[in-house]
Amino acid sequence: MPVVNRISRGEVSVGGIIGSTGDVNYGLDFGTASVDPASIAATTRGSVTFTLTGAKTTDIIIVNPPSDLNDDLIFCGAAVSAADTVSIYLYNPTASAINDTARTFSYVWIDMTA
């Protein structure tokens, strides 16, 4: 059943997320992670990881970059790349390498198996 029909009929479960099949999936968590990206070469996408215990590659991670991220780096998204590991992807479009300092990213983790 489409989510719109379920919501319009008032069948929303507080504290849960309605999946594509209409089932309610629980497991929403949020927090911050301080990461220090290694030097990213010119015109290259790099990645940096942090540990998120319990995260699985089938889960959903939403990451928000910090407002003080180096102006020349472009945040390209994030993914649970392995069990307990989140990868944050950054792109350097400039003509020289960028070695940014440690930054604090915020995240929302949706545990699809909880």
Region spans (language model):
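Extracellular receptor-binding modules and their adjoining Ser/Thr/Gly/Asp/Asn-rich linkers
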Residues: 2-55, 83-87, 91-114
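Short, flexible beta-strand-to-coil junctions
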Residues: 65-70, 112-114
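Low-complexity "stalk/linker" and mucin-like segments enriched in Ser/Thr/Pro/Ala/Gly
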Residues: 69-80
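Short, surface-exposed alpha-helix to beta-strand junction/turn motifs within ectodomains of secreted
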Residues: 55-67
